């Protein structure tokens, strides 16, 4: 099994842009985040942080590097596995605002209803809201998982920072 080349695009977006907004405050716990790889997210139990373990962007970066180097062998990723894992294994607690930011490449399985079903369950149980980022210039199937068309983004090397800023604005205005 080998890593898909697109995986590097996902990692680059997350590490360079997604968590690096000055609007987030990990230190005092008002911003909490975890990284959940897919597929088979449960296999990575020992490597996935709990809320609110990530008290800085540095810890999130270390966690991403660890996931990538030790466990992320992705050949046929299905986003629904990450949603299922969060639903069953990672209670966000009493947070008033829960945002799920999905960053991925093409996942035709998003159309089969499984990912949408888990997303709906996360919305019902924990009031999650869904922002989706597709990596690469090609259209893909992930848009169906976004809460609205305005919450779906396509990120490339040239617009990654802008996409991350838009996500930060959405989150900070909820």
Curated annotation (Swiss-Prot):
Domain of life: Eukaryota
PANTHER family assigned to the protein according to its UniProt record, in alphabetical order: PROTEIN CBG11222, PROTEIN CBG25533
Protein's name according to its UniProt entry: Uncharacterized protein C18H9.6
Species for this entry: Caenorhabditis elegans
Taxonomic lineage from the root: Eukaryota, Metazoa, Ecdysozoa, Nematoda, Chromadorea
